[in-house]
């Protein structure tokens, strides 16, 4: 969950998000070292009183400034490719949920159940109870079991949307007429908030996403209750 004046990422709640945080730190350190080196060279060139007007070319310097950037790019590219493959890997999901974007709400359908689905609307500010978050709470949460592979099929009924939950490292575009998929495993119980991340009209800011991760036995109780109400 984000908090005021936060400068970093939200706490990771999935293995993929943990990998993304490590990759961010890795890349940021490389960028910091490059920036420091370039700044040092600039300062040295500006402040030095020594000059050599006879150096017209240097094979050694050209080799260094060709090989060094290539090595740096490889150090960035390899971890990035690994994470890209991890994000696309979907093996034997225990639960599949279809998320449909509408102007301006989400609807969820648990495809492993015969009749389990609902619409998820934002709770208006005047209807919030103490402790709830403005513009982030919904009347129905997407409840999933923790420590289980979850597949989410994402599409849209009208215009482009994007199903995004930062703490899970998930962002998948919802395109009308196209079915995209993503997957995640939530490491711990909790409530995780997201929002539509594709400008989709006047009320784009008012279609939040709330994912609640619970132990498997609690999820079974919840699903049984929802099926009875249906």
UniProtKB/Swiss-Prot annotation:
Residues that hold Mg(2+) according to the record: 198
Cross-referenced Pfam families: COX2, COX2_TM
GO CC entries: mitochondrial inner membrane; respiratory chain complex IV
Membrane topology: Multi-pass membrane protein
Binding-site list for Cu cation A1: 161, 196, 200, 207
Superkingdom assignment: Eukaryota
GO aspect biological process, one term: ATP synthesis coupled electron transport
PROSITE patterns reported in the protein's UniProt record: COX2, COX2_CUA, COX2_TM
Ranges in the topological domain labelled Mitochondrial intermembrane: 1-14, 88-230
Residue ranges crossing the lipid bilayer per the database entry: 15-45, 60-87
Cofactor(s) in the UniProt record: Cu cation
Xref: InterPro entries: CcO_II, CcO_II-like_C, CcO_II_C, Copper_CuA, Cupredoxin, Cyt_c_oxidase_su2, Cyt_c_oxidase_su2_TM_dom, Cyt_c_oxidase_su2_TM_sf
Binding site residues for Cu cation A2: 196, 198, 200, 204
UniProt keywords, alphabetically: Copper, Electron transport, Magnesium, Membrane, Metal-binding, Mitochondrion, Mitochondrion inner membrane, Respiratory chain, Translocase, Transmembrane, Transmembrane helix, Transport
Catalytically driven reaction(s): 4 Fe(II)-[cytochrome c] + O2 + 8 H(+)(in) = 4 Fe(III)-[cytochrome c] + 2 H2O + 4 H(+)(out)
Co-factor: note: Binds a dinuclear copper A center per subunit.
Top EC class of this enzyme: translocase
Family per similarity comment: Belongs to the cytochrome c oxidase subunit 2 family.
Function: Component of the cytochrome c oxidase, the last enzyme in the mitochondrial electron transport chain which drives oxidative phosphorylation. The respiratory chain contains 3 multisubunit complexes succinate dehydrogenase (complex II, CII), ubiquinol-cytochrome c oxidoreductase (cytochrome b-c1 complex, complex III, CIII) and cytochrome c oxidase (complex IV, CIV), that cooperate to transfer electrons derived from NADH and succinate to molecular oxygen, creating an electrochemical gradient over the inner membrane that drives transmembrane transport and the ATP synthase.
NCBIfam families hit by this protein: CoxB (TIGR02866)
Protein name: Cytochrome c oxidase subunit 2
Lineage: Eukaryota, Metazoa, Chordata, Craniata, Vertebrata
Name of the gene this protein is made from: MT-CO2
């Amino acid at each position: 969950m984000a908090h005021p004046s936060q400068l970093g990422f939200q706490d990771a709640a999935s293995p993929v998000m943990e990998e993304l945080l490590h990759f961010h730190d890795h890349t940021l350190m490389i960028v910091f070292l490059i920036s420091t080196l370039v700044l040092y060279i600039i300062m040295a060139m500006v402040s030095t009183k020594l000059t050599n007007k006879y150096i017209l070319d240097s094979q050694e310097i050209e080799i260094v400034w060709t090989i060094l950037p290539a090595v740096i790019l490889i150090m960035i590219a390899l971890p990035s490719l690994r994470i890209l493959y991890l994000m696309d890997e979907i093996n034997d999901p225990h639960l599949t949920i279809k998320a449909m974007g509408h102007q301006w709400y989400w609807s969820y359908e648990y495809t492993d159940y015969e009749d389990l689905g609902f619409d998820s609307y934002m709770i208006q500010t005047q209807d919030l109870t103490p402790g709830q978050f403005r513009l982030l709470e919904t009347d129905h949460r997407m409840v999933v079991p923790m420590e289980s592979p979850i597949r989410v099929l994402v599409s849209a009924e009208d215009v482009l949307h994007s199903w995004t939950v930062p703490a899970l490292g998930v962002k998948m575009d919802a395109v009308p007429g196209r079915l995209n998929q993503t997957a995640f495993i939530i490491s711990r119980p909790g409530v995780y908030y997201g929002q539509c991340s594709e400008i989709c009209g006047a009320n784009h800011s008012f279609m939040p996403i709330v994912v609640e991760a619970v132990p498997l036995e609690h999820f079974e109780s919840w699903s049984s209750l929802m099926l009875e109400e249906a």
